[in-house]
Amino acid sequence: MNSGKPPAPVAAPEDFWRQPASARVWDYLGGGKDNFAVDRAAGDALVAAFPNLANTPRTTRWFAHRAVRLLASDGIDQFLDIGSGFPALETTHETAQKINIHARTVYVDREPLVAVHTRALLAESTPEGRWEFLPADLRDPDTILNSPIVHDTLDLDRPIGLLPSAVLHDLPDTDEPHQAVKHLVRALPPGSHIVLSHLTTDQLSHGDDDS
């Protein structure tokens, strides 16, 4: 089990399957099964416009886990994974606990179905470590920082690995997600690290033409 506490129920909107959701589209592009026809259609449309996007979820996942391994090897044993998405074959706490069995992780995501699937399917923690899930949005950093789940799971006086990986490009600039990240970084103790990946149009060309 993660902490031995019963999971809090999370209700999904009644029409959740009528509109594509970024977490489900990302899951589809990454070869997952936690998606619906509307998400697959959206994903196919994106790949048709930007063929290189097809491999992006796998690449960013590889990057994030490599970064977690490096941080854990360097002594970081606490991780705040924001925009965690649906559980993958190997998750942040599993990667970290292979190096340090005491590692702790808080997963954060705004998508209701991610919360349900994470609590139901995520692999158990080592007895010495722990993981928890917090339903929250990167754009509301104070809710994350002030959450009892975060404070009960992580020691905010010790270095933390902050992982807003592959999430900023999903938010409009008008919401100023970069300011939310700055707010989170300022709140972290000395010795903390941030692992960040971001889509760029540099490699997302329309096909393989010369434009």
Where are these regions (language model features)?
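Conserved beta-strand signature within the Rossmann-like core of class I S-adenosyl-L-methionine
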Residues: L134, I160-P164, A180-T201
